[in-house]
């Protein structure tokens, strides 16, 4: 029997397909099962237009058979089958797709749903098999043919016997190597797990004879093994069902079954979209962040399916980083089953779907914030930081998308509020959105810098995440209202500032002396316009705040980053009389006062004192 050569550029092209397109050997089973599903689809479609062909869904299935002794794995379908010409054209030509041709011929007709669109999937069998045999009989013929190949050297076709239409693919599994354990593909557990992973939602039963145990009839204390014909796939994807047919319990069970999380999701988003690009999405907002969410080990992405067949387990291109917490999947008939990860990055249809997913997630979160505030607060406590990182990253390019989703603790409401809610409550004479940054709400509440803002009846937002101020610097303003830190040199209170300047000028020599004593640690010493009951505090001049300095100093090579600090003195506090007296009569004591007040201000800000021993000695000395 003559060996025929592949019509394509045999070895080089076949090697390219096996080694480049498919880097993961286990997907060979996904490819062959998808081809089998296509064959049954074709038979169904033919039955609609050809009265000679009957289609009873119960008679159509895919069977997997593993023979460990002979090291063969067989995939059988009861589909349309192939003629000799079909075998020649579809299997003899690498990258020729019978499914693609069939779809092209019938593209004007509705209901044609063929998974495979490139003829490379079948050849993935050679990743795990030395010898591949295809036995097929077409529904249009009484004759059957056997196609056999050992790889790049070519193939043979000959007549054979087969009682019923359909196709049987027999793989002679390779011998194990040091790097690869090929015989695992003959293991029942492995086959079961691969079918569950990749082909669970193929719409025809995938059957396999599986080993079971049961009590013996004559002795129920002993067990015996028996074989059972088991269907391994669930067949109907939940995301393709009508939402009206499903309960939240169905979604929750699916979420847990897929191991998306260990507790029920906070929000479920189920969409069926038809149009230029058709797709189904089933997305979940987790109730809490995974343990590794804020680490480099966390991998974002949605499961990606083509007609119920998994293409990729984690498709990161479907989610922007700021929505990386979303779990779930996308299924589209418009995506090729055999597209590589590299090509997906440039796929227009995928980009379109990703854009729509982003818009949908934002819309659902906004709705949740408005109509289900309790759960939105839970969500924000888990993932709000990620949204803030989204505002800060990429030079603020995503701020318009995310600003309405942000929440911060309010000094007046004593709970998390949105920026829109804050602005809606602003007083008529209020120019800025005021905020204060610190380690916790409790510590911020006690900050002396907040006194004057609170006295004017203005609401203050509390920033307790490291990223908060960085994000706000990118946001700059919200609804034309600029953000202003309560620690900023200029709070925008003109009358108070005028009085402060007058006090500073009257005590210029005193403040200049204190600044000199502090030897470059502060940019300025001045009379405070913001302090009411407290004696001293620090404010900052410029864009870098004291809290931002603390954050940056925790990063490598940022030890020299410093905010421009201003030491503010409450000239109405009784301690100021002691300072003025010391300036007049005891400059050495004033030096201790200056150092002491500066260190007190550092402690208020949560900053370390440079010389704790000297600080303690100064306190003791002044107590004499």
From Swiss-Prot:
GO MF annotations in UniProt: ATP binding; ATP hydrolysis activity; ATP-dependent protein folding chaperone; unfolded protein binding
Record NCBIfam families: PRK05218.1
Residues that span the membrane, as ranges: none
HAMAP family for this protein: HSP90 (MF_00505)
Role noted for this protein: Molecular chaperone. Has ATPase activity.
Family indicated by similarity: Belongs to the heat shock protein 90 family.
Ranges for region B: 342-550
Subcellular location: Cytoplasm
Signal peptide: none
Keyword DNA damage: no
Encoding gene (name): htpG
Organism of this sequence: Clostridium acetobutylicum (strain ATCC 824 / DSM 792 / JCM 1419 / IAM 19013 / LMG 5710 / NBRC 13948 / NRRL B-527 / VKM B-1787 / 2291 / W)
Stretch list, region C: 551-624
Subunit structure as annotated in this protein's UniProt entry: Homodimer.
Lineage: Bacteria, Bacillati, Bacillota, Clostridia, Eubacteriales
Name listed for the protein in its UniProt record: Chaperone protein HtpG
Stored InterPro entries: HATPase_C_sf, Heat_shock_protein_90_CS, HSP90_C, Hsp90_fam, Hsp90_N, Ribosomal_Su5_D2-typ_SF
